[in-house]
Amino acid sequence: MKRATTTKSFIENGSVLESSVSIKIKLDDLSGGEVVELLEEHLADMYATSPAESVHALDLDGLKSPEITFFSAWKDSRLLGCVAIKELDTQHAELKSMRTSQFARKSGVASQLLQHVLDTAAVRQYKTISLETGSEDYFKPARNLYEKFGFGYCEPFADYVLDPHSQLMSIELR
């Protein structure tokens, strides 16, 4: 388990926390109700914002595949977000199911989760991390985050094809 700290504020029980927020990012087996609810919310939003044929988010069973490692972020007993990494081959992995809980948005949690995945990828010696996200305005904050971390737009990878509703991005690790 990795402990990360963010100094940005987030709302908890109706009040804004101004001090540093210590979060725990842990390997997750997808058995907890809070995680299942967050993933159901994630899928519902994906289908509400993109045509069904352009939704590449995985359901619970898909995330339990052996090539996928799933992480969740917590403050005490409160779920802040989740992310997964899918091994495509020994040098290439895909970021999947990045989601921040509604109350924890704009608090730095997504940055902590993304950094955790990049650190995990470096330890596993992947050379490239790729991802698919939507092209709609709803996904602009996610694209901005990925760009901030150095991801650039790329050609289709794995089983993806060009799609006007998708943006494909990747980063080369050092």
Q: What spans do the regions from the language model cover?
A:
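Residue-level recognition of the GNAT/N-acetyltransferase active site
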Residues: 101, 134-136
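Conserved GNAT acetyl-CoA-binding A-motif
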Residues: 121-134
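Conserved acetyl-CoA-binding loop-helix of GNAT-fold acetyltransferases
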Residues: 100, 106-119, 144-148
